[in-house]
Amino acid sequence: MNVSPPDTPKAYYGTIHIVEDDPGVSDSLRFLLQALGHDVVSHPDAESFFESAPPGGEDVVIVDLGLPGIGGAHVIRWLQQMNPRPRIIAITGQPQKVIEDELRGLPVVSVLRKPLSGDVLVSLL
């Protein structure tokens, strides 16, 4: 992943929640987003995310679809029921067919394929 901060101003003032089990990906995302001035909270799995304070409508949740245990699609379904709903960005290294199967029946969310581009991620915030 490109971890050098792009020359993009902070788009909003909420918290970014990262739900990612790979410490390397999670740390890289946190480094990039904090360098841009964002408040970032990392969660290594869905269970710890569910135990934390729920995100607000001004927040962004970046969730890995391939989480062990409770999967990323389950997290997205839970987030879709919130009002106000946070912005959701799904990340995955899975093939397109798996992505389609995981997200079938869910409202459209932004999906980024790993390896991630910092510029593309920031453009979705």
At which residue positions do the language-model features occur?
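Non-catalytic signal-transmission and effector/linker regions of two-component phosphorelay proteins
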Residues: 1-17, 23-24, 30, 47, ...
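Two-component/phosphorelay signaling modules centered on CheY-like receiver
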Residues: 23-41
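Acidic, metal-coordinating helix/loop segments flanking the phosphotransfer/catalytic sites
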Residues: 42-60
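Acidic catalytic/metal-coordinating carboxylates
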Residues: 45, 71-74
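The feature encodes the CheY-like receiver
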Residues: 68
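Short amphipathic alpha-helix used as the core "switch/output" element in two-component signaling
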Residues: 73-85
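Alpha4 helix (beta4-alpha4-beta5 surface) of REC/receiver domains from two-component response regulators
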Residues: 74, 95-111
